[in-house]
Amino acid sequence: MTLRPAGPTPARVRLTGRGVGLAGAGTALAVGGHLVDLSAVALAGCIVLAAPLVSWLALRARPLGPRLRVRRSLQPTPAHAGQDVSVTTEVGPSRPTPWSVAASRALNLGEAVPEALRGHAVLRAAVRPTPRGTSLHYTLRPRQRGRWPVGPLATRRYDVLGLATATEQVGAAVPLTVWPSLLTGTISDTGARSGLTPMRAGANDPSDEDTSLRTYQAGDDLRRVHWASAARHGELMVRTSEGASQAPVCVILDVASLNGSGEPGSQRHVALEWTVSVAASVAVSLLDSGHPVRLVLSDGGTAQAGLRGGDGQAGARWVRSRDAQGHAVLLDLTVDAGRREPGATIAGTRDDVLSGLVGDSQLGEIVIAVTASTSRDETSPLAVVGGTASRRYAIVVPVDRTQDAVPTLLEHGWRATPLPVGGDLPAAWDRLTGGTR
């Protein structure tokens, strides 16, 4: 979802029930007095009619936005789907005085929050007075990943006579990025180390020398270049002291076939969210295990566009940092997967992205695809990716009854296994890598 800068929102002013009744009575008196030629009655009717009109004009002429200060904080942000987010909104006058603070406390306040962040439940907030106004405290539990606005603040106020009311949106919305939920216990260390052993692509029995080398990447220390291997392989090679378990990993998130999938809760939408969660969980788990990881979106999502070509690769840049910043780089890529907005600029079509990955694997790289493609035609462009990689694994999420993806991938030398929505990811991972528990 795209957030646009919030501009001033005109107040919506209307008469209350009391104001409507008074306006009706005044109109009746004015018309009746005129018809029976009683000027005093007609004048009284005009005065009565003027009261709600003046109240309406008074509220309309004094918008609340410029006179009110709104501050909103969210914790944590970004958040994972299903994770509680605490929101505190502080409301008070721009120029605090005893009268303006009291007036701000008398406002009826509400928050504009998308259903994706609160479900179908009515949002309840704890309202507390503060020295400068009022604070609202409430908790959100995002159900869907995405980029969602929290706010603006909805206010309702009345004139002193209670004849008119004005509703107005005040303050700008605060963006909340919701990452996909991460599955717990995704990948055992045993499975990762036994299955992800780097070796030179095309070599059945890699030498000890080759298993301790990898392709040179921008920023590597030139003192680690192994010149003999560089001459033999025709490209710069550097020594790695991190051992065989530190093979670089390319995770391909392939949900292009589910772009724009149905309403929340539909079968295709649930499959989309599950596929994204599986890919994110695998990428983060392997990063935490010490593997350099890059995450490539086959749908050419906008989040990937800014990272393409950063170090000569067809996909996203390599992430090596195991801290929160490294996690954020990977997880931010998944937020918009399968949710392409109309007219959005994308990095390329699925065929463009996958064809750019053909032959793009470096020495010792592991390719792991998490795909929702099920037919042979959909799977074929993915099956030819990573032909020069040392290992290729695929986790296939079945979307319909078509079950051609796994056989197609196996025919092209992949290790592949199905993983239905809600399935056991650790068990599927062990089937792929031969890990034990």
Named regions from a protein language model:
Residues 1-4, 17, 218, 222, ...:
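Exposed, interaction-prone extracellular/peripheral surfaces
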Residues 1-71:
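Extracellular/lumenal glycan-associated context and N-glycosylation machinery
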Residues 12-17, 30-37, 117-123, 188-199, ...:
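Short N-terminal helix-initiation segments at or just after the protein's N-terminus
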Residues 50-310:
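An amphipathic, basic-hydrophobic helix/alpha-beta surface used to engage anionic
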